[in-house]
């Protein structure tokens, strides 16, 4: 039991660094826009470059997980992520920042799927959703660090020095993987004998799995709703609409992340509680759509209403833990790595599309006193609500393996 706790702790720790990197633009977006004279669409593209690279890496990552094993993939990706963080810290121009975000996205691409592939092979299926909850819950600590603690570090050290510290933390976590995570077993060695053509055929088989597309389409909108706010537009929204300072917006984003951390642990076992994947997933997705619609209608909340909205957003979007478990349950063991990474491609691809598109949407509105009006953000929330509802409608067609147990 102690070994399991240490293993999950180490994997959750390095995943938290990945989470920090992906969400780090949210707090410093106004700083980057001011320092480098970036428009909303440029900020959106800068943030989304991470997710574009992350999503693009998922198919080859799925093949690599099944051929070479989780441990080797994590060690390789760590080197790429460290390089990206250091380049971001030293970047002299927007082009270098984007290149660094791409490297960070590639380097961070395996730190959810590799641990989940490891859990799928070493633990019983009925515990998988709970382990997903712990992995995402621990990883969410990185998102937490990307809010108020990061705002404090930026105020004291600057954002460049802060990224050097993150690179050093990634190096330490990588050493822990070397020492703690078990070496990949012989099953990967057997799979490595298959041809590249066979590997891609396995990806094709995963795509053809019944209920793949309904789950895939909801994955496009689930996580992107949370990252849209905490990882990108939450900071500018709080600054432009409410006049929040760096520290104040960091604190409010922190509230949402804490709510998601707690929510991840609570949502994790809900599939067993209801003996269903679909019931909790649909509840979470529809409540998230409702929150986005509420923000689109209200525009500017009262201070108490704003706080409650951020708490609810963090808690409701944590249903992703059950959606991941539902996706995993669709595949036979030999396709788990490829199947999970295909769903992760949808998750991160959805973030890329959402962040890039909303940057273009916000740029359609004229700036007001150096910022954007509440109507710009209301439009963003409305578009996201519609996307979630469409994803939920598609998800209704999925089969629920839990109902067959």
What does each of the following model-derived ranges do?
Residues 125, 134-183:
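Helix-loop-helix hairpin linking two adjacent transmembrane segments in secondary transporters
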């Amino acid at each position: 039991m102690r070994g399991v706790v240490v293993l999950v702790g180490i994997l959750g720790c390095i995943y938290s660094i990945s989470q920090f990197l992906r969400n780090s633009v949210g707090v410093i977006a106004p700083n980057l826009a001011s320092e480098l004279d970036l428009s909303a669409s440029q900020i959106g593209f800068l943030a989304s470059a991470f997710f574009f690279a992350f999503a693009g890496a998922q198919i080859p990552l799925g093949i690599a997980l099944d051929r070479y094993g989780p441990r080797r993939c994590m060690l390789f990706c760590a080197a790429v992520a460290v390089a990206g963080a250091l380049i971001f810290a030293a970047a002299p121009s927007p082009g270098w920042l984007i290149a660094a975000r791409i490297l960070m996205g590639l380097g961070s691409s395996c730190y959810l799927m590799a641990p989940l592939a490891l859990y799928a092979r070493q633990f019983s299926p009925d515990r998988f959703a709970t382990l997903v909850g712990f992995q995402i819950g621990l990883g969410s600590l990185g998102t937490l660090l990307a809010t108020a603690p990061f705002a404090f570090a930026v105020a004291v050290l600057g954002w460049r020095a802060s990224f050097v510290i993150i690179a050093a933390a990634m190096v330490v976590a990588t050493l822990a993987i070397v020492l703690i995570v078990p070496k990949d077993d012989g099953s990967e060695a057997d799979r490595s004998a298959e041809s590249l053509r066979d590997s891609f055929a396995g990806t094709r088989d995963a795509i053809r799995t019944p209920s793949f597309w309904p789950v895939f389409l909801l994955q496009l909108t689930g996580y992107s709703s949370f990252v849209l706010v905490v990882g990108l537009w939450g900071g500018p929204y709080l600054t432009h609409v409410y006049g929040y300072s760096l520290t104040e917006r960091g604190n409010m984003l922190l509230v949402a992340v804490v709510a998601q951390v707690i929510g991840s642990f609570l949502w994790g076992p809900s599939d067993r509680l209801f003996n269903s994947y679909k019931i909790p997933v649909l509840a979470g997705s529809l409540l998230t759509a409702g929150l986005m619609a509420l923000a689109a209608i209200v525009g500017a909340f009262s201070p108490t209403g704003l706080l409650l909205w951020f708490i609810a957003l963090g808690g409701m979007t944590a249903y992703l833990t059950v959606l991941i478990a539902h996706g995993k349950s669709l595949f036979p063991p030999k396709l788990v790595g490829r199947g999970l990474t295909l769903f992760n491609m949808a998750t991160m691809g959805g973030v890329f599309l959402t962040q890039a598109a909303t940057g273009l949407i916000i740029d359609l509105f004229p700036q007001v006193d150096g910022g954007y009006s509440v109507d710009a953000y209301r439009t963003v929330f409305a578009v996201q609500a519609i996307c979630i509802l469409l994803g939920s409608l598609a998800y209704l067609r999925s089969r629920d393996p839990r109902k067959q147990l």
